[in-house]
Amino acid sequence: MAKEELIQFEGLVTEILPDARYRVQLDAGHEIVAYTAGKMKKNRIKTLAGDRVTIEMSPYDLEKGRLIFRHKDERPGGTGAPRGAPPRGQFRRR
């Protein structure tokens, strides 16, 4: 099957299932089971319940999908530092 035939949807992760699978509520209202794409596994991108994601699906099986992108959260005040990381100190140049 060619990549041009895949359909993309956006949704919200509602539940984390075993074996790197997720239950996703699509914006259209349908609920599907999606697995993590290989590039997300390789780059160790973690997905939690409540994250907005983009799903790729085959038009032949609309019950399963591949999670290809996790959208950045829009929480205010984000500094970009990992959670739990100590604050960085100021350095003076000589």
Swiss-Prot record:
Name of the featured protein: Translation initiation factor IF-1
UniProt-recorded Gene Ontology molecular function terms: ribosome binding; rRNA binding; translation initiation factor activity
Low complexity composition bias: residue spans: 82-94
InterPro entries the UniProt entry points to: NA-bd_OB-fold, RNA-binding_domain_S1_IF1, TIF_IF1
Chief localization: cytoplasm
Chain ranges of the S1-like domain: 1-72
PROSITE patterns: S1_IF1_TYPE (PS50832)
Region (Disordered): 71-94
Family (UniProt): Belongs to the IF-1 family.
Pfam entry (one): eIF-1a
Keyword RNA-binding set for record: yes
Localization in the cell: Cytoplasm
Function statement: One of the essential components for the initiation of protein synthesis. Stabilizes the binding of IF-2 and IF-3 on the 30S subunit to which N-formylmethionyl-tRNA(fMet) subsequently binds. Helps modulate mRNA selection, yielding the 30S pre-initiation complex (PIC). Upon addition of the 50S ribosomal subunit IF-1, IF-2 and IF-3 are released leaving the mature 70S translation initiation complex.
Gene Ontology cellular component list: cytosol
Subunit composition and interactions: Component of the 30S ribosomal translation pre-initiation complex which assembles on the 30S ribosome in the order IF-2 and IF-3, IF-1 and N-formylmethionyl-tRNA(fMet); mRNA recruitment can occur at any time during PIC assembly.
